[in-house]
Amino acid sequence: MGTSKGTRSQAQTSSATLNIGGNHVQITNPDKMLYPEMGITKGRFIQELVRLSPYLLPACEGRYLTTIRYPDGVSGKFFYQKNAPEPTPPYVQTAVSEGISYVVLNDITTLLWLGNLACIEYHPSLHKVHDPLPTEWIIDLDPSVEDEPRIMEAASLVGDMLEQLGLRSVPKTSGATGVQIVIPIEQGPSFTQLKELGHVVAAYLCERHPKLFTIERFKKNRGTNIYIDYMQHDKGRTIAAPYTPRATRYASVSMPLTWDEVRRNPMPRDFHLLNAADRLQLTGDLIQLEPKQHIEPVLEALASHIAALQKRR
């Protein structure tokens, strides 16, 4: 990776060009402050993206990517970017779905180009390009109140139930307020089948813990209960990627955890851009390390429960 410099006084403060495998990525305004409270400039943000890339790239590879851009930093205005930003460099891979030309984030060159455009958050599709089947199952826990002190307790209860079903799972902070439970699976079941299974899990947990969980779709009707969003895991939808930075004032990062860590009740803000890469050097990629598993036996075992819930609709 090399740097071509213009006038020395300007190159270090206004722009630099990175040469990555023969592709050139211009980094503009590296001193622009993206996270004022954390003192993280665009230059530092891109440095941390490089360190996160061995983990973030596998989570996004081969998927339709939506980003959230904050041109003036996380305290400024933002917008969702679905169509590939233009002009799109020739090294950037894209894929079209429903008339939208999405970026497909397969390499570090593309990641740095997006980082320079102040793409802070990375939200990939829940399936691969041109492949309708999911490669994992995700249960999303969404608090109804900010700084929900019971979110890790709720995650632990979901994990315990999955374990009773014979399923291994990896919890991750969303990087905002919620927690997602990732269940690596062998491809086969459809999104519809996994949503039906999610409904069974969610209904059972709501029945057992009515003061903690809800599946009420309207937020105004949830009270203080934590919403089990089993509907989010679907074709055409996205979720915050593992290891993506988030646009919070404390520069949080969506971080996979061990179940032992969950029981110690960490806060999502404990994992941020200034410590995430160092942590990952110690833990590795907890999601990629978890072997994929066949979920068909669970679907078969709970078929009667799934059918009963379908009749209630």
Stretch-by-stretch model annotation:
Residues 67-71, 169-175, 216-220:
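Short beta-strand
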Residues 106-174, 184-193, 310-313:
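Signature for HUH/AEP ssDNA processing cores
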